[in-house]
UniProtKB/Swiss-Prot annotation:
The keyword Disulfide bond applies. Its cofactor is FAD. Residues 26-95 are virion surface. The keyword Transmembrane applies. The chain crosses the membrane at residues 9-25. This is Probable FAD-linked sulfhydryl oxidase OPG072. Disulfide bonds join C43-C46.
Length: 95
């Protein structure tokens, strides 16, 4: 399934989950939700790419919400088809 049809919605959900963890402080629940989202992406290649990136960067073992947050920002920027959608990390406030 083509990510252009569902990609923005999924990224919105990912960043909502991260923002909620910034408010409630439940990093473990946040990581479980994020892994569930990523491991059920409708595109097999996207699913594989994202889970490998999560594993390679030890996201699931991190207790630092901002590490996880900035990881997903970098992943988003690496996958953005159009540079105009890239997130300027210098303008992002830590959670």
């Amino acid at each position: 399934m083509n990510p252009k049809h569902w990609g923005r919605a999924v990224w919105t959900i990912i960043f909502i989950v991260l923002s909620q963890a910034g408010l409630d402080g439940n990093i473990e629940a946040c990581k479980r939700k994020l892994y569930t989202i990523v491991s059920t992406l409708p595109c097999p290649a996207c699913r594989r790419h994202a889970t490998i990136a999560i594993e390679d960067n030890n996201v699931m073992s991190s207790d630092d919400l901002n590490y996880i947050y900035y990881f997903f920002i970098r992943l988003f920027n690496n996958l953005a088809f159009d540079p105009k959608y890239a997130i300027d990390v210098s303008k992002v406030k830590p959670l």
